[in-house]
Structure formats: structure tokens, C-alpha cells
Amino acid sequence: MKNFISILSIFIIVSCSSGKTPVEEGLENQILHWGNGSEPQGIDPHIVTGVPEHHILIGVCEGLTITDPKGGRDNLPGVAESWTLKEDQKTYIFNFNPNARWSNGDRVTPEDFVWSWQRALTPTLGSQYSEMLFYVKNAKKFYDGEINDCSEVGV
């Protein structure tokens, strides 16, 4: 019986100490291990509405600014490294971080954001978040079909 317990103890110690932890493997191989709960229904940021989908999008998408992870009230730089509010108190100028890149290495551009906001305002897309952009000049008019030229939207 002592031999059995000794062998079992050695087996347990060896099996627990060999190999790499998921964190070590992830760091070495650039893998993010994520416990998301349930499977996402999609990953299109303009369409999805569920919590599992947004957990993924928060991890892979960055806005012009980000919220302070320490709970502060100020916005922090995201893709935009800085921004200014013009005297009219309606127009923001964003200065993009030149190092901001997509996962394929392409540079993130202002046109990417313009395209994204214009797409979100396309009524046939069915985004449930379109009205969040209605504060932008002509956004609601474009969404309602009162104007047809997306370039008239103040993005």
C-alpha cells in the first residue's frame, strides 16, 4: 500500500508540474484565452445586441476614445491620440495615432470611422444603435430618407 501511495503521489506531482499554464502558452504563442459564457450570434459591431458579442467586440475594437479603466470621468486616447473641440462647441477634430493598425497591419484611417458611422446609419442594415448617432449633423435626416447623400452627414 505504501508503494501505491508513493507512486500515486509522484504521478500527481509530475502531472501537475509539467507543461505550461494557459497564461504561459498564451503569452508565448500570442493566444488570448477567453471564457465568454455562451457562443456569440455574430460579431458585426453594427448589428449584434447581446452580451457575449459585446464582450468580444470590447476586446478587439477600439474607439476614437476609451473610458478610463480606473473609473475616471474623462475620456482617454484610443485610436485618436488627441482631440480638440472647436469654438462652435459642436465640432471635434480628432488626431489619429499614426501607430494605430488593423490586425492585418493596415493603418487605421479617419475614412474607416466615416465608413463605419455611415454604415450604422443605413436604415436597411437594421442596426438597433443607429439613433445613438442622431446627434451628428444630418444623421437622422439620412436615416429617415430626407437626404440621400451620406456625405452630407457631419462625420
Label each PLM-derived region with a short phrase.
Residues V14-S15:
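C-terminal motif of bacterial Sec signal peptides marking the signal peptidase cleavage site
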Residues S18:
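Short, conserved catalytic or interaction motifs in soluble domains
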